[in-house]
UniProtKB/Swiss-Prot annotation:
Family recorded in the similarity comment: Belongs to the PRA-CH family.
Organism phylogeny: Bacteria, Pseudomonadati, Pseudomonadota, Alphaproteobacteria, Hyphomicrobiales
Pathways per UniProt: Amino-acid biosynthesis; L-histidine biosynthesis; L-histidine from 5-phospho-alpha-D-ribose 1-diphosphate: step 3/9
Name by which UniProt lists this protein: Phosphoribosyl-AMP cyclohydrolase
SUPFAM superfamilies per the UniProt record, alphabetical: HisI-like
Cofactor: binding comment: Binds 1 Mg(2+) ion per subunit. Binds 1 zinc ion per subunit.
PANTHER family hit by this protein: HISTIDINE BIOSYNTHESIS BIFUNCTIONAL PROTEIN, HISTIDINE BIOSYNTHESIS BIFUNCTIONAL PROTEIN HIS7
Listed EC numbers: 3.5.4.19
Entry-linked InterPro entries: PRA-CH, PRib_AMP_CycHydrolase_dom, PRib_AMP_CycHydrolase_sf
């Protein structure tokens, strides 16, 4: 567990938006949204969430940690797949309620649990009044079924 804490969000809007103190604004669930892009080419890789512990561990280790809302657990990105995200730069938006990580992905250079480089591999369209998804043709860079298989009992 990290010992790093974050100061309370300042009530002064100018201090929040222009000041030099990082005081992330966590939502009522204790999370902040994180947008992740490739540090070299800018490709959008994923959107995730961090709680205070994940954020502190990311700052302290330089490896991205997130909070899994579906598993309700801390998640070190790449721990199972080997596709760790080395943080090159972290930015916050004007009111400090969202973060942007620029990362170098290690391992297979894949970010998505499907084995693809990006979680954004489908385009959204509208055909005959219905939402459609079209795969962009990107192929998995590793065998996700093998990598994430459950051990047999």
């Amino acid at each position: 567990m990290s010992a790093l804490g974050f100061p309370k969000t300042p009530s002064d809007k100018k201090a929040l938006e222009e000041g030099a103190v990082f005081s992330p604004r966590f939502d009522p669930a204790g999370l902040v949204t994180v947008v992740v892009t490739d540090a070299e080419d800018g490709m959008l890789l994923m959107v995730a969430h961090m709680n205070a512990q994940a954020l502190a561990l990311t700052l302290e280790t330089g490896i991205a940690h997130y909070w899994s809302r579906s598993r309700n657990a801390l998640w070190k990105k790449g721990e199972t797949s080997g596709n760790f995200q080395h943080v090159v730069e972290m930015r916050t938006d004007c009111d400090q309620d969202a973060l942007w990580l620029r990362v170098k992905v290690l391992g297979h250079d894949a970010t998505c649990h499907t084995g693809r480089r990006s979680c954004f591999y489908r385009t959204v369209g509208l055909v005959d009044g219905k939402g459609t998804l079209v795969d962009d043709g990107s192929k998995p860079l590793f065998d996700a079924e093998f990598t994430y298989r459950k051990p047999s009992s």
